[in-house]
């Protein structure tokens, strides 16, 4: 279980403060206007930002000050952060060993994830030789191969066309279910959120303004629907 208790980040002395509980294996969408604090929330969970106050626990262990490299969390950004001089296999392998010295079991795990992502025939290629969708599959594979209990997505598929975005969302949801991973996904699209998350959190002005069923947001009946421009 992920639990944030009054986690606070001072943005130009304006406090952004979040309290949130997410159960193990749950898939949650994080929605809200631009600049509301959605990415800040993910970066606090991942450890890329150090909170001014509050606490963060994962499965009962305090990770409030744990460095990002030691947190049981993986994060995928819109900019996939692949290394252009490394092959697909090497980029995925970094998720297992930064020195790329993989044993037989790690090699098999890497190839199994690549097959799951449908990129096992691209392992010798460089990122520059791939399409945008293929690069995001590689970046996702690198996250999944780490087998961390929490996966954070910061709009990684927003630049893809609608059909490809739908394909990637389905792939993420299925993979998280198979690995029993907790998923938190930032999105500007309630429709995308509804595809993989039954529960949504709406962030506004550096606070969690609402949380509940995604379908309630879509219907326009939720108190936070208006924040997203949805009317009943």
UniProtKB/Swiss-Prot annotation:
InterPro entries named among the record's database cross-references: AAA+_ATPase, ABC_SmlMolc_Importer, ABC_transporter-like_ATP-bd, ABC_transporter-like_CS, P-loop_NTPase, Thiamine_ABC_ThiQ
Keywords: ATP-binding, Cell inner membrane, Cell membrane, Membrane, Nucleotide-binding, Translocase, Transport
GO cellular component: plasma membrane
SMART domains: AAA (SM00382)
Binding site for ATP: 32-39
EC number: 7.6.2.15
Cellular location(s): Cell inner membrane
Membrane topology: Peripheral membrane protein
Role this protein plays: Part of the ABC transporter complex ThiBPQ involved in thiamine import. Responsible for energy coupling to the transport system.
Name the record gives this protein: Thiamine import ATP-binding protein ThiQ
Organism whose genome encodes this protein: Shigella flexneri serotype 5b (strain 8401)
Upper classification of the organism: Bacteria, Pseudomonadati, Pseudomonadota, Gammaproteobacteria, Enterobacterales
């Amino acid at each position: 279980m992920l639990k944030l208790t009054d986690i606070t980040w001072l943005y130009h002395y304006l406090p952004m403060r979040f309290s949130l509980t997410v159960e193990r294996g749950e898939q949650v969408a994080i929605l809200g206007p631009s600049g509301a604090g959605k990415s800040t929330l993910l970066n606090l969970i991942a450890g890329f930002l150090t909170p001014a106050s509050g606490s963060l626990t994962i499965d009962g262990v305090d990770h409030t000050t744990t460095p990002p490299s030691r947190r049981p969390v993986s994060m995928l950004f819109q900019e996939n952060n692949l290394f252009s001089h490394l092959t697909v296999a090497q980029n995925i392998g970094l998720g297992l060993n930064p020195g790329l010295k993989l044993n037989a079991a790690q090699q098999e795990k890497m190839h199994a994830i690549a097959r799951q992502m449908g990129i096992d025939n691209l392992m010798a290629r460089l990122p520059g030789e791939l399409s945008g969708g293929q690069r995001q599959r590689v970046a996702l594979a690198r996250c999944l191969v780490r087998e961390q209990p929490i996966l954070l997505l910061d709009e990684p598929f927003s630049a893809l066309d609608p059909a490809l975005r739908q394909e990637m969302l389905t792939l993420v949801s299925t993979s998280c279910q198979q690995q029993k991973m907790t998923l938190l996904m930032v999105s500007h699209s309630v429709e995308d959120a509804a595809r993989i998350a039954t529960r949504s959190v709406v962030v506004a002005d550096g606070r969690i303004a609402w949380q509940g069923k995604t379908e309630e947001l879509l219907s326009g009946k939720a108190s936070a629907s208006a924040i997203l421009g949805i009317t009943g």
